[in-house]
Amino acid sequence: MTAPSSGVPGGGDGRQPLTGRQLLLLAFAAAVVTANAYYIHPIIALVAKDFGVSPSEIGLVPALNQIALAAGIFLLLPLGDRFSNRQLATLFAAGQLMGLVVMAFATSFWVFVAASTFLGFSTITPYLLPAYASKRVEPHQLGKATATLTTGVIAGILVARVGAGWVGEHLGWRWVYYSAAAVMLLVTLLLPRIMEGRDKSEASPPPGNYPSLVLSVFPIVRQHPEVLLSGAIQGLGFGIFLAVWLGLGLHLTSPEMGYGADTVGYLAAISLLNLATTPALGAWADRTGPRRARVIISLMQFTAVILLGFLGHSLWLLIMPLVLLNLVGPLIDITGRMTFLTLPAGVRTRLMTAYIVLMFIGGGLASWAATWVYEHEGWHGTAMLAAGLSALLVALSFIALRFDPARRNKA
């Protein structure tokens, strides 16, 4: 098993490093397959009204989607260390396509929930791509490559939320999923052309059958316990993101505020800033070190979350803390991944499994909590929930400094 620090181009598997064009194509694929989970954000009130359900009931849609994603990643993502990422990514993309089609035509709320849950279970492709790319870039370019893929994810989230808001308001929420299914069909056909199969010179897959492969996550995590801390931090960060934006989807379309779903979508255009800033901030994290960078951005995030509660009465004032949240949010994920993607290539996918499972458990719980709290306490309750999550994230970020190699060397 060859460590990425061996100096062999592409992480030591004998392949040439990814070209800029190939990395951009991977980022595009990540954008499309990631977008599917975020269409619900601006149209959540429209879907709830159409099916005649309460905020806490509609909150089950994103919550179960995220929990199913965590289950799918735990059960399916470890296969990336054994089978071709190309084959797996294409198969799971086809699963997403099936889920989108059922959601588009569902006439029962619970059928819609079930299809959304299956969609989440199938959303594995964007989490295969970072480990795939990390084997094909030079170690000193890992932050930049991870940031490029994260930028693709951000672009997908942006298009999903802005586009879904406009389409849902003017054409109806079902057209959001008709369109998503059409684009997903295209990506399912294109993925085999974007990715390469497993190379003969690549490290041998881990021994054992499927159950032993899945369970092998646990001893690997015990060997690298920091991944649990990074995963918990990212779970909190992702939970804050979902709590804020699902709460906004209900708050801004409420009688008190009186805006439409398209306004919620337009507000999500703030994420455009990330397309320009995330690669540069990823390079900054390379220079600063992921753990120290994470402490800084966690404090900035806490400041932004506190402002949300005070400024919730005004759409225009909300823009200020939302801009700050969008600037720093992706860096929590990037710095978290950087703490373990420099480890040997043969264990990265399973470490990514633990990391992403924790991320989506946090996101799923926060999704339901945010809609439940909104139903009972309104926007200020949602903001207080986000503030509590952010305070815990700051504390864990400081604790994670004990894993910083620079500190260990001084000790």
Task: Describe the residue ranges of each PLM region.
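Juxtamembrane intracellular "pre-TM" segments in multi-pass secondary transporters
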Residues: 8-17, 196-231
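Helix-loop-helix hairpin linking two adjacent transmembrane segments in secondary transporters
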Residues: 147-195
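Intracellular juxtamembrane helix-capping segments at the cytosolic ends
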Residues: 125-137, 331-344
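C-terminal transmembrane helical hairpin of 12-TM major facilitator-type secondary transporters
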Residues: 291-336
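Helix-to-loop junctions at the C-terminal end of transmembrane segments
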Residues: 73-84, 277-290, 374
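Conserved MFS/SLC helix-loop-helix module at the cytosolic interface between two early adjacent transmembrane helices
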Residues: 71-109
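Cytoplasmic helix-loop-helix junction between adjacent transmembrane helices
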Residues: 116-152
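A late C-terminal transmembrane helix in Major Facilitator Superfamily
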Residues: 342-379, 386
